[in-house]
Amino acid sequence: MSDILNTIIATKHQEIAAALASRPLAAVRADAEARGDRRDFVAALRAKHALGKAAVIAEVKKASPSKGVIREDFQPAAIAESYAAHGAACLSVLTDRQYFQGDARYLEDARAACHLPALRKDFIVDEYQVYEARAMGADCILLIAAALELPKMKALEALANELGMAVLVEVHNEEELDAALQLKTELVGVNNRNLRTFEVSLATTLKLLPRITDGRIAVTESGIATVEDVRLMQASGVHTFLVGEAFMREAEPGEALSRLFFAQS
């Protein structure tokens, strides 16, 4: 685990302890189990594939540890509406406060503003956060292989599925992919950003892609910034993309999405 990831995970455990002290697990579980309005995250991606289109998981992100504030005028509902109007398949919403200036209400607001399924983008290490995710309306959660032992990943995946959520498992190398492929999820995300150096290489996806088979969906994450990047991935058989920063830096995020993915089609 990288130094920054170690730091973030330590923070998460502190946050969970504080959350448990103010709101017990049973209460959050009850909220999660009472939450209706489930949207099928995987089906939304496959629907785009069936039309021969890129399936874009469009990110709602204010800031990051490496870049600082990315979008000053940050209005999650308006951003989500823009994405939905311009062909996004799903949303990804940052809920981590300390490092990404995210918030649970951003996911709630973004999802309420459109018809798209939403991923809770956070560093999930405990069942409490899985219940939180469903309670706030998430349709999918992120599990980062670098941050979790396999038995824990399996347990968190099982709970997410029980609550009606999909799981996107994120990997960066062969060892992490070995673990990810032992989960049931169809969604395998390849993070092109090295969490130790923050360097980005699209070759990471291309290297791991041949092993993401058996009906699984490979999701390329980080570093997709140009039409050439998109064409490279599509020519290699990748048709699902998680993109945030390239859209967040533009005045109209949805129009930026359309230019990047659909202008050439």
From Swiss-Prot:
Pfam families: IGPS. One of its GO terms (molecular function) is phosphoribosylanthranilate isomerase activity. The keyword Amino-acid biosynthesis applies. GO terms for biological process: L-tryptophan biosynthetic process. The lineage of its organism: Bacteria, Pseudomonadati, Pseudomonadota, Betaproteobacteria, Neisseriales. This is Indole-3-glycerol phosphate synthase. Keywords: Amino-acid biosynthesis, Aromatic amino acid biosynthesis, Decarboxylase, Lyase, Tryptophan biosynthesis. Belongs to the TrpC family. HAMAP family: IGPS_B. The keyword Glycosyltransferase does not apply. It catalyses: 1-(2-carboxyphenylamino)-1-deoxy-D-ribulose 5-phosphate + H(+) = (1S,2R)-1-C-(indol-3-yl)glycerol 3-phosphate + CO2 + H2O. Pathway: Amino-acid biosynthesis; L-tryptophan biosynthesis; L-tryptophan from chorismate: step 4/5. Its EC number is 4.1.1.48. Gene3D superfamilies: Aldolase class I (3.20.20.70). InterPro entries: Aldolase_TIM, Indole-3-glycerol_P_synth, Indole-3-glycerol_P_synth_dom, Indole-3-GlycerolPSynthase_CS, RibuloseP-bd_barrel. It comes from Chromobacterium violaceum (strain ATCC 12472 / DSM 30191 / JCM 1249 / CCUG 213 / NBRC 12614 / NCIMB 9131 / NCTC 9757 / MK).
